[in-house]
Amino acid sequence: MADQLTEEQIAEFKEAFSLFDKDGDGTITTKELGTVMRSLGQNPTEAELQDMINEVDADGNGTIDFPEFLTMMARKMKDTDSEEEIIEAFKVFDKDGNGFISAAELRHIMTNLGEKLTDEEVDEMIREADIDGDGQINYEEFVKMMMAK
């Protein structure tokens, strides 16, 4: 399954994996998974976190290593995000609920995820997704960006 991913996707997932793997030991624990989920506005129970890990923990050692993470991501990409999930994600980014994601909101979320981005990088992300050129991302643009992965 993971062999259907492009090199670019694998590189992106490696980056995401390192965001989760806070102590850099090459595995994601329930604690690390919980930290990231909470920074995204989710509030999973310990049992839910354990279930998420068990789902992809091929060798049964209680943590997720990178190959297991890749398999999970490949699976997730196959059953592409439901519209509901995309709406939820949009709401997480759209802090003030005005229907747009501003550069400030994007920067805030990325910083929460542990991504220290320069203003240029944030502006570049906005520019890439900002089809109508108004300097912010509306829902349609967000959906296109999410589906383009």
From Swiss-Prot:
Keywords: Acetylation, Calcium, Metal-binding, Methylation, Repeat. Pfam families: EF-hand_7. Ca(2+) 2 binds at residues 57, 59, 61, 63, 68. Ca(2+) 3 binds at residues 94, 96, 98, 105. The modification N-acetylalanine is found at residue 2. InterPro entries: CALM/Myosin/TropC-like, EF-hand-dom_pair, EF_Hand_1_Ca_BS, EF_hand_dom. GO terms for cellular component: myosin II complex. The keyword DNA-binding does not apply. The keyword Glycosyltransferase does not apply. Residues 8-43, 44-79, 81-116, 117-149 form the EF-hand domain. This is Calmodulin. It comes from Macrocystis pyrifera.
